[in-house]
Amino acid sequence: MSDICDANKLKHRFRGYFPVVIDVETAGFNSQTDALLEIAVTLLKMDDEGLLGIDKTLHFHIEPFEGANLEPEALAFNGIDPTNPLRGAVSEKDAFLEIFKAVKKAQKASDCHRSIIVAHNAAFDHGFVSKAIERCDLKRSPFHPFATFDTATLAGLAIGHTVLAKACIMAGIPFDNKEAHSALYDTERTAELFCYIVNRWKTLGGWPLLATSESEDMDSEE
């Protein structure tokens, strides 16, 4: 029983990694040259039954870094006007200092030793986040430098679809395409999808794994 209770702690679910769901909106596809315009970060928590859920979300509009490229097609797609003063945009550095503070606090509270980015098509978001952190010369990032959890891959395995909107609907998660391509909306839907997949795997008996010692005991009894 104690082993099962221990497995229900977040620190043991992903080998000490604290999952942080992230979505970014950008002014193009090139993380080195194109502006990061919006970021949302959803922190997760695990209940006493070992079920994963949303804790809270941070959201920032970002000022384009100096010399950043702004692709017109990307701006038309996400509907962001970087010059609009009503965005209340902050610098990359200010945003990431707040993100680091919140992530490290939640990571510590969960007894995890590092955080790992969860995102839909995670290589894209991870690339922009990593490049922004590098530009800001921020040290001691809580995020793993290359490992991620990609919900496109996980959804393809667990649900049979890789498109965020369709995967959410198939999982019973409401999705409004009119709200899509907002970092705030997309990260919370991605978080719900990730939690659904992790919790579904648990309810189907995939977690916790049978302890090695228990397996050996069963073999000896046979």
From Swiss-Prot:
Q: Where does Mg(2+) 2 bind?
A: 23, 25, 181, 186
Q: What is its EC number?
A: 3.1.13.-
| Protein name stated in the entry | Ribonuclease T
Q: Name one GO cellular component term.
A: cytosol
Q: Which residues form the active site?
A: 181 (proton donor/acceptor)
The protein's organism comes out as: Shewanella oneidensis (strain ATCC 700550 / JCM 31522 / CIP 106686 / LMG 19005 / NCIMB 14063 / MR-1)
What gene does the UniProt entry assign to this protein? rnt
Q: Name one GO molecular function term.
A: nucleic acid binding
The Exonuclease domain sits at 20-194
What keywords are annotated for this sequence in UniProt? Exonuclease, Hydrolase, Magnesium, Metal-binding, Nuclease, tRNA processing
Its needed co-factors are:
Mg(2+)
Family in the record: Belongs to the RNase T family.
The keyword Endoplasmic reticulum belongs to this UniProt entry's keyword annotation: no
List the Pfam families: RNase_T
Which residue numbers mark the site Important for substrate binding and specificity? 29, 77, 124, 146
What this chain does, per the entry, is described as: Trims short 3' overhangs of a variety of RNA species, leaving a one or two nucleotide 3' overhang. Responsible for the end-turnover of tRNA: specifically removes the terminal AMP residue from uncharged tRNA (tRNA-C-C-A). Also appears to be involved in tRNA biosynthesis.
An annotated GO BP: DNA replication proofreading
Provide the assembly information.
Homodimer.
Q: Which residues form the signal peptide?
A: none
